[in-house]
């Protein structure tokens, strides 16, 4: 496997999504020169791959562009991946990302319902999401789309539209996750107030797919059923299977693909 490490260029998140605690942390970023010093040390260790673990890489575009241009000037030769937001991605930013070694981006989509996006303060439009995935494809940057199943206010038809959007965006990978009322979020407060919380381990973020919220629209069982349906519909398309078989290069890619099931 390629030697890999993670790097933080910023801490916290400038976004205020109601289902996430990262926005509660004061957003701070490191000076690009400080990050470059760390990357210089990393290169001496033989590391080839970087995972920038920022909640939103390049949230401050001025600092992000400066860092990536410094990476290009230093000719580190790293390939890298990061989490970012659809609203950040422009042709200019994607061009610098690609030139500095970016080969994949993780992008939160959450839902195809614009009303739900607004309700939970996502701060991104469906049009921006479509543009972001199109831009990534144009620049040869692979994408992982993140989707939430079962946000309060959603109907089954909304979830089906979200699944359809994941296919329309033509993500290289899609991660379908059930809504989780994490302590400290507005989503948690809403769930408790309306008695939507599944009391058993409802506050525990254990990384499982167990549904934690039950609203008047969708039962816990239905949420899990729709999550499984989403995975099957996205990953078992003949065209997708053929594309992945052609592109798979090693065991780790195969393992990550099957982890969704």
PLM regions with names:
Residues 92-95, 152-168:
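Catalytic cores of alpha/beta
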Residues 186-261:
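Radical SAM enzyme core and accessory elements
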Residues 1-146, 164:
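Radical SAM [4Fe-4S] cluster-binding motif and immediate context
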Residues 27, 121, 151-154, 215:
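Pocket-edge positions in alpha/beta enzyme catalytic cores
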Residues 33, 127, 156-160, 221:
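Residues in well-ordered alpha-helical elements
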Residues 178-184:
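Glycine-rich beta-alpha loop elements in corrinoid/cobalamin-binding modules
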Residues 64, 159, 188-189:
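Histidine/acidic-residue-rich catalytic or RNA/ligand-binding cores of hydrolases
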Residues 136-146, 151, 165-177, 236:
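Conserved beta-strand->loop/alpha-helix structural units within folded catalytic cores of enzymes
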